[in-house]
Amino acid sequence: MHKLRKIIHIDMDCFYAAVEMRENPALRDKPIAVGGSVQQRGVLTTCNYPARKFGLHSAMPTGQALKLCPDLILLPVNITLYKQVSHQIKQIFHRYTDNIEPLSLDEAYLDVTDCVQCSGSATWIAEEIRRAIFNELHLTASAGVAPLKFLAKIASDQNKPNGIFVITPGEVDNFVKTLPLSKIPGVGKVTGQKLLQMGLKTCGDVQKLDLTVLLNRFGKFGQRIWQYSHGIDEREVQSHWQRKSVGVEDTLLRNITDIEQGIVELERLYPILEQRIKRACPDIPFERFRKLGVKLKFEDFQVTTLEKSAVEFKRENFIVLLRQIWQRRQGRAIRLVGLQVTIPEQKAEQQMSLW
């Protein structure tokens, strides 16, 4: 019998547009979209909720979108910025688990089955993650919590935007029975229409059918429909992300300008960094961590980092870096301080010992 899992699906709300509104708050209440121009025969990558009131949606041709919403503000895709923010989101995920399966820049599965934070509650963990994303990055995320991947994904869409929906193990059967087949990942308009022609509207309808009926009509995907309709999804969260660094950062309660205040914050973060290194890299001694980094975020939300190789991993070397990077402040107050180390490459014998 498979171990009962706790899976969270995080889906950022209109991610690209949300990042653009964060960068330029004047856009917040205006219909905006990110995508290609009419001249490029482009399509919308995403749009904010004011734009969606006009019927706009992702993948809509830009020309059509402008006809529906003549006042639409169209912004070009800034993929460098979105990747940067996506990385920051993933760093929040890593506070709870390393078992992360990114689906895109704004969407990921997390397996928190063995997580000890929040008393092991996947619901509380999901809420903490959403709160951290909002407080630290000024973005909203929706979350779905369930024991199966496909249900976690469906759940994250239930209370969008900025919501959470939980399906406990005991609720799976009832939830699946009434679930419209159109909600199943991969069931588009064409497949949905074919299912309707067969008299199948919900997963409960499929439960009355023999598997061979769906196999004959839809091939291998028919098996997937049948399994999901019976609450079966044995796929595990697959993490292909190789961790390259360990870090800790904190948004301050009040902005600071004095270097001595920065050192106090560094002193507070340093032992937390040590704990995270021990947890993330238990087989690597501290003396091998020599590439150290300090990160600052200013009151204007600009971020700067300074990384240097040191003779050894110790508190004093981080303070040296902090004093150097503090000179980049240029009169701006500091709202966040962070520390990080680059994980050294393992020696051949250490790599072999893993097998």
From Swiss-Prot:
Catalytic activity entry: DNA(n) + a 2'-deoxyribonucleoside 5'-triphosphate = DNA(n+1) + diphosphate
The protein's required cofactor(s) are namely: Mg(2+)
Coiled coil stretches, renumbered:
none
Q: Which UniProt keywords apply?
A: Cytoplasm, DNA damage, DNA repair, DNA replication, DNA-binding, DNA-directed DNA polymerase, Magnesium, Metal-binding, Mutator protein, Nucleotidyltransferase, Transferase
- What does the record's cofactor remark say about binding? Binds 2 magnesium ions per subunit.
Q: Where does Mg(2+) bind?
A: D11, D106
- The answer to whether the entry has keyword Cell wall biogenesis/degradation is no
Could you tell me where this protein is found in the cell? Cytoplasm
The reply on keyword DNA repair is yes
Question: Where is the site Substrate discrimination?
Answer: Y16
GO terms for cellular component: cytosol
Q: Which GO terms describe its molecular function?
A: damaged DNA binding; DNA-directed DNA polymerase activity; magnesium ion binding
- GO terms, biological process: DNA-templated DNA replication; error-prone translesion synthesis; SOS response
The active-site annotation reads E107
Q: How does this protein assemble?
A: Monomer.
Q: PANTHER family from the entry?
A: DNA POLYMERASE KAPPA, DNA REPAIR POLYMERASE UMUC / TRANSFERASE FAMILY MEMBER
Free-text function comment from the UniProt entry: Poorly processive, error-prone DNA polymerase involved in untargeted mutagenesis. Copies undamaged DNA at stalled replication forks, which arise in vivo from mismatched or misaligned primer ends. These misaligned primers can be extended by PolIV. Exhibits no 3'-5' exonuclease (proofreading) activity. May be involved in translesional synthesis, in conjunction with the beta clamp from PolIII.
UniProt record similarity statement: Belongs to the DNA polymerase type-Y family.
- This chain belongs to which protein, by name? DNA polymerase IV
Lineage runs: Bacteria, Pseudomonadati, Pseudomonadota, Gammaproteobacteria, Pasteurellales
Which gene underlies this protein? dinB
